[in-house]
Amino acid sequence: PRFFGRSAIAQEYGAWDIEILAEINNAPRLTHDDIRREAERYRASGADVIDIGCTPGLAFPGLGDVVRELVDVGMRVSVDTFDVDEIRTAVRAGASVVLSVNRSNLDIANELSASEVRWVAVPDLGGPIETLEPTIAKLDEWGVSYLIDPILEPIGMGFMASLERYANARRRWPDAEMLMGIGNL
């Protein structure tokens, strides 16, 4: 509008809010100092939650220490793994969000339901959005806090279909909080 000599119209964004979750990928391959530096950099850049990305099949014996160190300096921490032992360790050390839960590891959410942790519910591996329904039903039954992540696919590898999944998830669960992992883009 300024180009045409007019003032800009104030944009109304609504009542929605977001949290920025920044993932430290392949954390088991990094030193504790590297993880801490990366977490500090992400927090300084505006991240609300620091996500410790575990590596499938690679043990992470220092996971509890890493989570505890970050929580002790005031960071909110999440853990990105399906491994129930890693989830248990991270939550006991103070992680407040777990990525991810589906029918393959759902029992751990019940086991840890007394904690304040929020779970990120995802479809079963390779499954359609309908596979979220039994997971969400159980989380609701157990009174567990969760977000829904229909999974965003990379451009050229199912991106448009994944956007349609997000729209479908919003229609199915209009009041649910959602997570959109844009790192795949």
Where are these regions (language model features)?
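Alpha-helix-loop-beta-strand connector modules within alpha/beta enzyme cores
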Residues: 3-20, 57-89, 112-119, 164-180
